[in-house]
Structure formats: structure tokens, C-alpha cells
Amino acid sequence: MNIRSNPETTRAAVTTGALPSSKKIYATPASAPDLRVPLREIILSEGAGEPNLPVYDTSGPYTDPTVVIDVNKGLPRPRTEWVKQRGGVEQYQGRDIKPEDNGNVGAAHAAKAFTAHHQPLRGLDSPPPRGEGSGVGGATPAAFARGADHPPMITQYEFARRGIITKEMIYVAERENLGRKQQLERAEAALADGESFGAAVPAFITPEFVRDEIARGRAIIPANINHGELEPMIIGRNFLTKINANIGNSAVTSSVEEEVDKMVWAIRWGADTVMDLSTGRNIHTTREWILRNSPVPIGTVPIYQALEKCEGDPVKLTWELYKDTLIEQAEQGVDYFTIHAGVRLQYIHLTASRVTGIVSRGGSIMAKWCLAHHKESFLYTHFDEICDLMRKYDVSFSLGDGLRPGSIADANDRAQFAELETLGELTKIAWAKGCQVMIEGPGHVPMHKIKINMDKQLKECGEAPFYTLGPLTTDIAPGYDHITSGIGAAMIGWFGCAMLCYVTPKEHLGLPDRNDVKTGVITYKIAAHAADLAKGHPAAQLRDDALSRARFEFRWQDQFNLGLDPDTAQAFHDETLPKDAHKVAHFCSMCGPKFCSMKITQDVRDYAAGLGDNEKAALYPVGHAGMTISGTIEDGMAQMSAKFKEMGSSVYLDAEKVKESNKALS
């Protein structure tokens, strides 16, 4: 159903309510009984003869009927207390909102500001004076575990390196296990069946495993300390493959209301993170509305807003303006920033011979700035300062691929890989500063060139999580690039990519609407799940097997509901067989009642089950374990062999002679 908010504040309406035959459930980790980790339970029909199936859920409170949704107030903020309990942070006034933050929009076009204001948190630069900052019962807060001579820890990476398991780590471990007590035998069998290309997927995810993966830099929990509404999730190749959905307004279309609706719509269908790529008016306000209503991590490309602040002219960009934009967005609670610090002056000429040049918006902005000033990129020269700033808020890096190929003709060229090598250098700097890092990747890459991208990224970037846009495997299908890219996404996900950025049917053609968002999300959920199956993820195949059993047993409603998109599955079925009676029929409109292979198979099974021992034995080949009547089969085979020789040992025989021979045998 839709809940419409107060029209005097905003006209936003978002989709709420459970998916068909599903309910929101919560798991409680043994080590943190105060946590409630969300899952979606798919309720199977009474005749299924098997338990309901819990699945990963990204939809937040919007599918919980016990929660009253009011987009004007935003979601609850339980994570804020987790952060404060760890210590090492301070609450402060924050910067004032400036006219340029919203593109100097006039009053006639200004969006309504979000009503609730939360003072931001930031990490302390140094420990508090001795005797201050103690935790509950006088205990030292976790942030100060390195001692009084060291600055407090703020980021998940710093806690992990110190050996401290945070609530976020406990939360994501429970989430990755889907709330089930693992059946290790089945899990190990699934792992043995898959090909993980060096990934170390365990049979059971523990908080300690999560901590270790983050400490090694192989995984991140994007979780700004100011995003209190967040339900933590993890990105890494040894976990479930995640997907991102892009939303955002532009200078010519969309509104705040539409973008909030698209965010809720995207997470309903399975988006693990959402990027707000707004480039038009009301950027700050749009982002605030999205963040305050988002249970998933939100990413941005700060250079887009910085460009709006200087009238859209890349030449006018400055480090000071960009730094102010980073602070603005970090205070709001953005969880990860795409920063194109690998676009260096010396690499730009490498793109001159490309078919499609520089296709990244952020990459082209920085390339123009570098050429106009004939200087090294300020993102590169000020990278240490960027790290210090992002660490204060635990904003994760998503190091952008500003020189990614925009056509398969440009795939894997020197410009692309030169930037990737620089991103590897920057990753090590960010880690040394205590920041979490993932790496962005292409783009447009034909199938035979995909694996080298994954292998080179792992080598150059120390196994930091890879996050790719597709890649698109061919350039000939405008309007269908969700398919051309879904092929590449499934492949690179199998090879080890941790998160896949969706592509919608509108790619290269226009701004996606909510229908395009759903199509993109479902397409990429398929790709991510296919990758998890191929890697041998221990829980991945449970849903496939449940749906296959429902299909074979003609449990149509279970078949719809176990799918990624129950609404579309049932709509297609009902186009030709709409009646309730058809939901229990043992056929569909493809084959009809007489030619359904599964119905025929069921009839054969039923027939075999009713046979006596002698009749069953006749169905088995010689020596088969099912043959229980000694000599019966051997005698029959010997008789038929003699008959074959008697008839002339020919494959094709005269019909009349065969009839006469059969009479003699009877």
C-alpha cells in the first residue's frame, strides 16, 4: 500500500507493506541480544511439506506492518547510540546550509527542507583529558583502546585492526547467515561444488570472520557515524554479492518526492545500497530527505555538487570548495564517496585515441580542470587531507574509475589500467590513515576481457572490494543495456567482484523512472545470485531448490512468491490462466494439460510406485541395485540376443518376420 505524507510539508508517497506471502522477521545474535537483524520470511503453502524460507531483506521498516511510516519525520536512529557508546566522538553545531548547497535555487523552485534537524557527530582528533570520556560503569570506551597517547578510533577499519568487534560487525554476520543455524554438512557441500577463484567463503559467517575481513581490507561496512537510520551491511567478495541502485534528479527532470520514492522502491526489490547522483536544483535538500528515510548505505559523487556551486564550470573548481562539500555531505550522513583521485594529468593524453574518450562525468570534470590549469588534480595532491576528513565521520572511499572504458573498443587500454594502478597506491594511503576503501571498475568490457579486470584489481589494490558498473558486454543494444550489462555483472561477480552497480533499460537514453529502477534491480539481483551460486555460497541454492520443488509440484503461488518478482510472475501466468482454479492446475498455457513434461514425469513416478517387485525389476538394467529377482533380466536379455541373431543381426527388420518370431516366443 502507499502511505501519503502531509501535503503541507512534502508530497512524497512511498510504497509500504510486505511482499506477497511474506512477513518481516528479526533474528537476535547470541552475542548482542539487544540487536534485531531484519529478514524476510517467505510463507509457503500448507501443502508444501517444508518450512518457510528466510531470505536477505533490504527493505527496512517499510515492509514491517508494526512500524508507522512518516517520511516527514524519517526513520528511527538506533545506530547513533552505538556510536556514542564506543566514544571518541563529539556532537557539534555543524556548518550552516548555504544557498549554493542547493544550487542557488530561487524561492519559487526551492524544495521544502526536511523538518527534523540532528546535530552531527565527528571523531575527536585527540583523546579527551584524563578522567573524561569514561564509558558505562567507568570502563574505558572502545574508541580509546589504543591508549591515552593515541587518537581515538572512529572507523570500522580501525576497530577491526585493533581486534575489536563492533555492533555493526555482529549485525552483518547475523544478516549474512540469514538467521539460520547453519547446517555445516550442506554448506560444505555447496562450497565444494562451486568455483570461487580464490575467495575464502566460509560455511558459517562469524563476527570474528567479519572483523578479520575488514582488518585485511577485503571488506567494508559503509556506515557514516551520522547515518543513525542505517541497517548495517557488508561489501566483500567473501560475502553475498551486493548490488547498488543509482537515483537522483537532473537539471531537466525529477523532484525530491520522486527520488525518495525511487529509493524506497529500489530497496523494496533488493538494492543493498543507493547512490544519489543528483545534479540539478535542491541537491542538499534531496539528499537530506533520502538519508533520513534510508535504511541502506547512501553514496554520492561530491564533485557533482561542487560543480553546481561554481555555476557548472569545472575550471572554477577549487580545493577549498570541494573540501567544504565533503564536510557538508559527511555531516548529513553520506556513507561512501566516489572520488576520482586516480585521474591524473599525465594520463589524460592516453584517452585521445579512444572511440568514446572519457565517459565518466567525474572523470571528465577533473580532466578539464587539469588541462585548464595544467596542474595535477587537487583530488590527488590533497588526498591525505581527504583521508583525514573522511576518517572523522567513517565515510568509506569508493575510489572512482574516471577513465573507465565507455565502449568495448576501449576496454582494458592503457588509460584504464594506469588509473587502476594509481587507485592501488591510494588504497594503501587510505588504509594507513584508517579509512575503509572499495574500488570502482568498468564499464564496457567484452566477455573474454572481463576476468583480467578482476585479477588485475585484486593484484593492484590489495584485494580491496571491487565495485563495477556492469560491465556491458556489447554496445549494440540501446534500450536493453540492463541485459548486456547483466551478463558481464554475473561473470565478474563470479570472479570476485563484491558489489555490482545496476544498469537500467534507460542507460545512455534518459533518466530512469521507478519502473526502470525495478527492472534494473531485479536484473542485477539475478546476476548477483547467479554469481553466489557459481562461487558455491553455502546458502545461495536453498531458494533455487525450494522454487524448483514448488514448480515440479505445481504449487503455483509458492512458485510466484519464491521468485525475485512475485508480482510480475503471477501477472504473466494470469494473462492466460487467470482463474483461481488455475493456481492448482497441473499445467500452464505453454504446454497445456497433455504435454506438460513435469506432469508426465509425475505420472511415470506414480505408475512406477504402483508396480510389484517383478515388474519393477524388469525396469532396471542388468546388475542394477534395483533388480531383486535373480535371473529374470539375464534370461530376458539372452532370449532377445538370440532372437536378434536369428533374424539376421540387422538393425532394421522386416515387420512380418518380427511378428512371426514373436508368435513363436509366446
UniProtKB/Swiss-Prot annotation:
Pathway assigned to this chain's UniProt record: Cofactor biosynthesis; thiamine diphosphate biosynthesis
Keywords assigned: 4Fe-4S, Iron, Iron-sulfur, Lyase, Metal-binding, S-adenosyl-L-methionine, Thiamine biosynthesis, Zinc
Cellular component GO terms, alphabetical: cytosol
Name of the molecule in the record: Phosphomethylpyrimidine synthase
List of residues binding substrate: N246, M275, Y304, H340, S360, R361, G362, D401, G402, L403, R404, E440, Y467
Gene assigned in the entry: thiC
Top-level taxon in the UniProt lineage: Bacteria
Gene3D superfamilies: 6.10.250.620, Radical SAM ThiC family, central domain
A GO BP entry: thiamine biosynthetic process
InterPro entries: ThiC, ThiC-associated_dom, ThiC/Bza_core_dom, ThiC/BzaA/B
Enzyme class, first EC level, given as a word: lyase
EC number: 4.1.99.17
The reaction(s) this protein catalyses: 5-amino-1-(5-phospho-beta-D-ribosyl)imidazole + S-adenosyl-L-methionine = 4-amino-2-methyl-5-(phosphooxymethyl)pyrimidine + CO + 5'-deoxyadenosine + formate + L-methionine + 3 H(+)
Species in which this protein is naturally found: Rhodopseudomonas palustris (strain ATCC BAA-98 / CGA009)
Binding site for [4Fe-4S] cluster: C588, C591, C596
Iron-sulfur is among the record's keywords: yes
A single MF term (Gene Ontology): 4 iron, 4 sulfur cluster binding
Cofactors: [4Fe-4S] cluster
Sequence similarity: Belongs to the ThiC family.
Cofactor comment text: Binds 1 [4Fe-4S] cluster per subunit. The cluster is coordinated with 3 cysteines and an exchangeable S-adenosyl-L-methionine.
Record text on subunit structure and interactions: Homodimer.
Residues at which Zn(2+) binds: H444, H508
Lyase recorded as keyword: yes
Function of the molecule: Catalyzes the synthesis of the hydroxymethylpyrimidine phosphate (HMP-P) moiety of thiamine from aminoimidazole ribotide (AIR) in a radical S-adenosyl-L-methionine (SAM)-dependent reaction.
